[in-house]
UniProtKB/Swiss-Prot annotation:
Reaction it catalyzes: Endonucleolytic cleavage to 5'-phosphomonoester
Xref: PROSITE patterns: RNASE_H_2 (PS51975)
Domain of life: Bacteria
PANTHER family on file: RIBONUCLEASE H2 SUBUNIT A, RIBONUCLEASE HII
Keyword Cytoplasm annotated: yes
Species name: Nocardioides sp. (strain ATCC BAA-499 / JS614)
Domain RNase H type-2, residue spans: 29-220
Gene: rnhB
CDD domains given in the database record: RNase_HII_bacteria_HII_like (cd07182)
Gene Ontology terms: cellular component: cytoplasm; ribonuclease H2 complex
Gene Ontology BP, a term: DNA replication, removal of RNA primer
Places the protein is found: Cytoplasm
Protein's recorded name: Ribonuclease HII
GO molecular function: manganese ion binding; RNA binding; RNA-DNA hybrid ribonuclease activity
Residues that bind a divalent metal cation: D35, E36, D129
Length: 240
């Protein structure tokens, strides 16, 4: 990943489309944003989205913002606008089994790479949310709180979040005791109580401490397994 082109600046009041405008002033196009949903959940898949929005008014999505800041209804409205307006977009689903096999950080990076690779139009530049993603094959920039300040990342976050929420709602029909349709696999009091009462379902991620505890298993050794902290602590409601 790299920095913005020499001479580029982003004003704090540049708005949601400031990064894209700054890059286009240097002739950089197309610009993709990529983000994920479900990293902090202890059940269900990890989903990554990527989006390239057109320049100008055609790329302005009414109501677009970080998916976590939108209501479910608002996210659905934005989703429909994004798939209609985007020059190219993609969604990648990484199963809970693959998350367990790879570990969450590796699975997360792999999902983001796959989402960019699936775009019909290869991007010239990629904006990512929060941390750099190597192996994309093009220059890019990690943007702090990117899903709140860069439109293409916000669009990607909506694609990922809506897709994952729909999947978790469908999975709820198979395992209704866990109420996946409500908490989407994140830990809440209801989810914790269900884990205690029923043990893990087939779609729970067995690397998480609370899931292993419910299964009567010891936590994974972080040294032997190379796990990052997020996988070895109790996950709480509201994490990604």
């Amino acid at each position: 990943m790299s920095e913005l082109p020499r001479g580029s600046t982003i004003r704090k009041d540049a708005g949601l489309y400031g990064y894209e405008r700054a890059l286009r002033r240097h002739g950089i196009e197309p610009i993709a944003g990529v983000d994920e949903a479900g990293r902090g959940a202890c059940a269900g898949p990890l989903v990554a989205g990527a989006a390239i929005l057109p320049p100008g008014k055609a790329g302005i999505v009414p109501g677009l913002a970080d998916s976590k800041l939108l209501t479910e209804r608002a996210r659905e409205r934005c989703y429909e606008q994004i798939v209609r307006r985007a020059v190219s977009w993609s969604v990648v689903v990484v199963s809970h089994e693959e998350c367990d096999r790879l570990g969450m950080h590796v699975a997360n990076v792999e999902a983001l790479r796959r989402a960019v690779a699936l775009l019909d139009l290869p991007p010239a530049y990629v904006l990512t949310d929060g941390f750099p993603v190597d192996g994309l094959g093009v220059p890019g920039l990690a943007v702090w709180k990117g899903d709140r300040v860069a439109a293409c990342i916000s669009a990607a976050s909506v694609l990922a979040k809506v897709t994952r929420d729909r999947i978790m709602t469908e999975l709820d029909a198979s395992w209704p005791a866990y109420d996946f349709k409500t908490h989407k696999g994140y830990i809440t009091e209801v989810h914790s109580a269900a884990l205690t009462a029923h043990g893990p379902s087939p779609i729970h991620r067995m690397r998480f401490v609370n899931v292993r505890r419910a299964a009567g298993l010891e936590p994974l050794d972080p040294v032997q397994n190379g796990e990052e902290a997020v996988e070895l602590v109790e996950v709480t409601e509201g994490t990604r």
